[in-house]
Every structure is written in C-alpha cells, then in structure tokens.
Amino acid sequence: MSRLKKRYLADVKPELQKKFAYKNLMQVPGLVKVVINMGIAEASKDKNSIQDCVKEMTMLSGQKPVITKAKKAISNFKLREDQPIGVKVTLRGQRMFDFIDRFVNIVCPRIRDFRGFPSKCDGMGNYTLGLDDQQIFPEINLDEVKRTQGMHITFVTSAKTDEECVELLRLLGIPFKNLPISVAA
C-alpha cells in the first residue's frame, strides 16, 4: 500500500468525517480516478508529435495512454474526422495514489513562481488543473523533449460538493491558493 493511501485511510478519512459530520465512514468522499490529458495542436502537421507525447505520457504515468481522435471535421482548424488530436491516460488504484504522491511532493515544488492552484471545482466534486510544461516531471529526460507540451490533470472524486472536494484534495496535499497546506505525514 502506498504512503498516500495509508495517510488517506488513517488521517484524511477521519478528519473529513469529523468536519462534515458524516454518520457512516462510507459516506466520506474519496478519489475515484485521475485523468491526464494532452491536447496536441501540431498533430495535424507533424505525425511524430503524437508518438513523442505517447512516449512522454507513458513515462510520467506508468501506463500506455489512449490516442484521442477528432469526432468531427472542422475546416477552420484543418481538422478531419478520426484524425489524432491528443493522448489521455486514466489512473486508478495504486498508480493513482503513486502519481498524486509524486505530483504533490516532487512536481509542484518544481513549478516556477508557484503560489498554489486555484480552489475552484466543477460543481460535481471534480477538480481540473492545467500545467504549461511537461518538463517539470522528473521522469521526462530534458534532452529528448522536442517541444514543450501542456496538459490537464483531472481529479475525479466521490465528493458531492465542491467544498468536500477541495477539502479532500487539500488534506491529500494538493497546494491551493489562500488555503493552509496539509503537512504530509
């Protein structure tokens, strides 16, 4: 069992139960999955850009990503139907907790001029953040990077409200602006 999962079971769950006055421990929100998505604008011009992103995503997530394709053609973007436009990977279980642990303890401190993420969720208990550069991940070899590529990371939780979602992620160590940081155990 990963360090973050142990911390979630031992510290975070009881704290959330106490704060939101849940009667049953099964009502306490938890993480369901983490989705990492890279949209690749140059995919229509450069066919190798998709393969480069697949390789980088495999290194930083630990599993092979799915290539996403365009649902319909848009002539203004020179986009045809079924043309590859990005890659995504869904992490669950052990890999999810390992990724979040590395993200909080290694990647976030490497972000330049970082003051915390905004604490705005989507209203359904999910939180998405955007990164401008994949080079902040230690798994990526800087010599092999041909272009800087941003990504979106979505934390899908079983929380019913945004307040529960933000509190869960804060207790797991995600640094938010204007909120105290939960100290990692």
Curated annotation (Swiss-Prot):
Pfam family, one: Ribosomal_L5_C
Keyword Transport (UniProt): no
UniProt xrefs under InterPro entries: Ribosomal_uL5, Ribosomal_uL5_bac-type, Ribosomal_uL5_C, Ribosomal_uL5_CS, Ribosomal_uL5_dom_sf, Ribosomal_uL5_N
Annotated TM spans: none
Gene3D superfamilies: 3.30.1440.10
GO cellular component, one term: ribonucleoprotein complex
The entry's keywords: Ribonucleoprotein, Ribosomal protein, RNA-binding, rRNA-binding, tRNA-binding
Claim: Ribosomal protein is one of the keywords in the record: yes
GO molecular function, one term: rRNA binding
PROSITE patterns in alphabetical order: RIBOSOMAL_L5 (PS00358)
Function: This is one of the proteins that bind and probably mediate the attachment of the 5S RNA into the large ribosomal subunit, where it forms part of the central protuberance. In the 70S ribosome it contacts protein S13 of the 30S subunit (bridge B1b), connecting the 2 subunits; this bridge is implicated in subunit movement. Contacts the P site tRNA; the 5S rRNA and some of its associated proteins might help stabilize positioning of ribosome-bound tRNAs.
Subunit structure: Part of the 50S ribosomal subunit; part of the 5S rRNA/L5/L18/L25 subcomplex. Contacts the 5S rRNA and the P site tRNA. Forms a bridge to the 30S subunit in the 70S ribosome.
Family recorded in the similarity comment: Belongs to the universal ribosomal protein uL5 family.
Stated name of the protein: Large ribosomal subunit protein uL5
Organism: Protochlamydia amoebophila (strain UWE25)
